[in-house]
Amino acid sequence: MKLNMTQLDMVRRQIDRVKAFEGGLYHKKYADITSADIQTAEDFLSLPFTEKDELRAVYPLGIQAVPDRDIVRIHSSSGTTGTPIIIPYTQKDVDDWATMFARCYAMAGITPEDRIHITPGYGLWTAGIGFQLGCEKLGAMAVPMGPGNTDKQLKMMMDLKSTVLCATSSYALLLAEEIAKRGIGDQIHLKKGVIGSERWGDKMRARIAAELGVELYDIYGLTEIYGPGVGINCQKEEPMHYWDDFVYIEIIDPVTGQPVPDGEIGEIVITTLQKEGAPLIRYRTHDLSRIVPEPCSCGSAFPRIDRIIGRSDDMIKVKGVNIYPGQVEDVLKNVAGVSSEYQVMIDHLNGRDIMTLFFEVEPEADRELVEIAVGAIFKAKVGLTIV
């Protein structure tokens, strides 16, 4: 999906701003680039990618693009895989984030009448505060629980009659199991769940929806790009609408870096169009998805990407075939009798790649028949024989 002229103008303004801020990441990175160089969508593709390692290299505040007096808060990545990335926000950034998140809630059919139970963490992490910002912008009641303390979570959920649950998929499943175990389902008033942060398969999705009795929505975002709230699926279809007046999304081949045709799976690359505190241009997220070119039956004109199927850095190559975790899940979800738990093991023996797939079979299923079915579908869909 090419940049339109409005987005192109916004990109040029971003280039002027980031180049003008001495000491910032792009002041040096774009030393030989000017906004006048970017006259077309094709010119935009000549801009270099921005990589996560570049953001880590300028820790703590090297990606800041405005004076300190304009910064009202910071958030940070966890730093579990390396140096944390600190993201500065201006007041406009915070307000824009709230606007995007409120759109997400509205897209899911959530209204000011709802009571929104927020379980993701607060503090430096963007999740909890992002869910709350959008809730307050929408005008709904925020119940800012944060993570943990299941007894307190369930008590507040019952006493306040919360109608929307915001959570990671694993925590939503834990709460669903606890509600079933305690036999308190008739005291729970949840109608919708907004789930983010973790990739989850269809079997897990169906289990949470059934046990909680809710409609589920996938919300997308990442710390470097505001946080959660960049996009969400609507009430009609599974792909996620994203807010292309705030972010431009392109999909590239993760190996060559070249754009792929709309509809093909590749790596998401994001350019922020209005961000002030820490704008990013052509930022490689390593998340895998595709542009969904067909118009949505909900009538929204906002463009769409498909659910995240994995990460380009999770890719493994077996016998010359690129395999992503999402492809394994796609196979398993189509075989009756297979649970949502699986493990893939890759061995290299005598010059040959051997892929072993371990998965759980539901108690009532015929294990031998299930194994045959999984092998056949994997061969047909992925092109590999598994053992």
What are these regions (language model features)?
Residues 1-76, 82-99, 103-107, 188, ...:
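Nucleotide 5′-phosphate-binding alpha/beta core
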Residues 106-140:
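Conserved AMP-binding loop of ANL adenylate-forming enzymes
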Residues 42-45, 98-115, 150-162:
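Conserved ATP-dependent adenylate/AMP-binding module captured primarily in the ANL superfamily
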Residues 94, 121-123, 170-171:
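Short glycine-enriched loops at secondary-structure junctions
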Residues 86-90, 110, 127-130, 176:
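Short, conserved acidic/polar surface loops in the N-terminal third of protein domains
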Residues 1-19, 138-387:
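Active-site glycine/GP-rich loop and adjacent strand/helix microenvironment
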